[in-house]
């Protein structure tokens, strides 16, 4: 019962008066980032998008803040100055970096290419790492692939509630 619920969950934003509430609804996780496009205040638009999405270049030309999920395509030819955070799984990142397996080294190389970005590296069974130019945080061990998706949902919910990635990931380490 629980696994069915969580395997089809995504986050939906609802606004009531001056507050925003997040509700979980049952929906397939396929295209999670594309489904999770939301304005979290009047002046700031945020989009979670896969890097193979045909609309990516359009979002990079607008006032949207872009959270980029790197899935199957290189993005070096794009202007990534509007990208806030890159989400990438270890297998994909390792392929980009000539097979390197060390998570911290992969993150260093990603940030060398994209120095103003923040990166979340999602590992197979070990959890996830957050890295920016000043900070490296590890999200404790996750149990399965489904948990990797749940981690992303928690991360996005934290963003919408106004918490920074660093705060939400730090809480995850200490829970």
What are these regions (language model features)?
Residues 5-13:
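Catalytic-core segment of enzymes that process non-peptidic bonds
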Residues 12-138, 160-171:
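Ribokinase/PfkB-type carbohydrate-kinase core domain
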Residues 7, 109, 154-155:
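Alpha-helical scaffold segments in soluble metabolic enzymes
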Residues 138-156, 168-172:
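Short glycine/threonine-rich catalytic loop with a Thr-x-Gly-x-Asp
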């Amino acid at each position: 019962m629980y696994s069915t619920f969580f395997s089809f969950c995504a986050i939906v934003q609802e606004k009531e008066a001056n507050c925003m509430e997040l509700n979980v609804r049952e929906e397939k996780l396929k295209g999670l980032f594309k489904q999770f496009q939301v304005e979290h205040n009047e002046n700031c638009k945020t989009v979670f998008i896969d890097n193979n999405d045909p609309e990516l270049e359009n979002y990079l030309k607008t006032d949207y803040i872009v959270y980029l999920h790197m899935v199957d395509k290189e993005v070096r030819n794009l202007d990534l100055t509007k990208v806030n955070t890159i989400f990438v799984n270890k297998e994909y990142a390792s392929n980009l970096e000539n097979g390197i397996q060390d998570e911290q080294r992969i993150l260093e190389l990603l940030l060398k290419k994209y120095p103003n970005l923040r990166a979340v590296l999602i590992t197979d069974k070990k959890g996830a790492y957050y890295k920016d130019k000043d900070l490296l945080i590890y999200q404790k061990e996750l149990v399965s692939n489904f948990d990797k998706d749940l981690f992303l949902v928690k991360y996005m919910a934290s963003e919408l509630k106004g918490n920074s990635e660093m705060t939400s990931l730090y809480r995850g380490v200490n829970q």
